[in-house]
Amino acid sequence: MTITIALPSKGRMKDDASAIFERAGMTITAVGNDRSYRGRVEGWDDVEVAFLSASEISRELGNGTVDFGVTGEDLMREGFAEVDKRVEFCARLGFGHADVVVAVPEIWLDVDTMADLGDVAADFRARHSRRLAIATKYWRLTQQFFSSQHGIQLYRIVESLGATEGAPAAGSADIIVDITSTGSTLRANHLKVLQDGVILHSQACLVRARKESHADEPVVQAIIDAVRAAL
């Protein structure tokens, strides 16, 4: 069978992923021209490469339409419920680091932890007759973190279609859940991350779709072993 590896199609993620595969003895070349969305691995005739966006890679992995992919852990865990039943996180690759965090306005001086925020959520309902509004693109991770892990129920999620960090200042939300690498954008918007408000330390991962056909396919384990040895 042919094994398909989905890799980022552009930017730093593409360069970093290609470098790791090259160290693993799996040099990747485009089929056709440099702007092609298909590729191959030199010396691995039963492996093909698809160049996709990070969000496309996570979707194709979750649906099982590719065998391997390099994408952010945040995209996989946000995109699918019980994601570990669908895919295996084979290796964390050491690039694409970013944290999914809970951030509140800096002027909330007495709110530093999720417990403090739980008190605020209850107070919002009592004082304003509405629930605390959270702007985010990460509704699944937000619900799991607030409701399942911290027992906070009195909130509502406002879907963020633009720059999430601007939502509190614009009045469309009270707080945010967003992804950040350095925190500089949050600080520029006068937001602070709660002390225990890191939902996920994300980075680029080699992810395998869980397929029965992989059990008897030696090239599957060979790919995993080669990448792990290159880290």
Curated annotation (Swiss-Prot):
Name the Enzyme Commission number(s) assigned to this protein: 2.4.2.17
Q: Which GO terms describe its molecular function?
A: ATP binding; ATP phosphoribosyltransferase activity
Q: Which domain of life is it from?
A: Bacteria
- Catalytic function, reaction form: 1-(5-phospho-beta-D-ribosyl)-ATP + diphosphate = 5-phospho-alpha-D-ribose 1-diphosphate + ATP
- Subcellular compartments: Cytoplasm
Cite the InterPro entries for this sequence.
Answer: ATP_PRibTrfase_cat, ATP_PRibTrfase_CS, ATP_PRibTrfase_HisG, ATP_PRibTrfase_HisG_short
Concerning CDD domains, the annotation shows: PBP2_HisGL3 (cd13593)
Its primary localisation, in coarse terms, equals: cytoplasm
- A single GO CC term, please? cytoplasm
Pathway it works in: Amino-acid biosynthesis; L-histidine biosynthesis; L-histidine from 5-phospho-alpha-D-ribose 1-diphosphate: step 1/9
Cited Pfam families:
HisG (PF01634)
The alphabetical list of record keywords is: Amino-acid biosynthesis, ATP-binding, Cytoplasm, Glycosyltransferase, Histidine biosynthesis, Nucleotide-binding, Transferase
Listed SUPFAM superfamilies: Periplasmic binding protein-like II
Protein role: Catalyzes the condensation of ATP and 5-phosphoribose 1-diphosphate to form N'-(5'-phosphoribosyl)-ATP (PR-ATP). Has a crucial role in the pathway because the rate of histidine biosynthesis seems to be controlled primarily by regulation of HisG enzymatic activity.
The entry describes its oligomerization and partners as: Heteromultimer composed of HisG and HisZ subunits.
| Record comment regarding domains | Lacks the C-terminal regulatory region which is replaced by HisZ.
The similarity comment for this entry is:
Belongs to the ATP phosphoribosyltransferase family. Short subfamily.
**What's this protein's name?**
ATP phosphoribosyltransferase
Kindly list the organism's lineage.
Bacteria, Pseudomonadati, Pseudomonadota, Alphaproteobacteria, Hyphomicrobiales
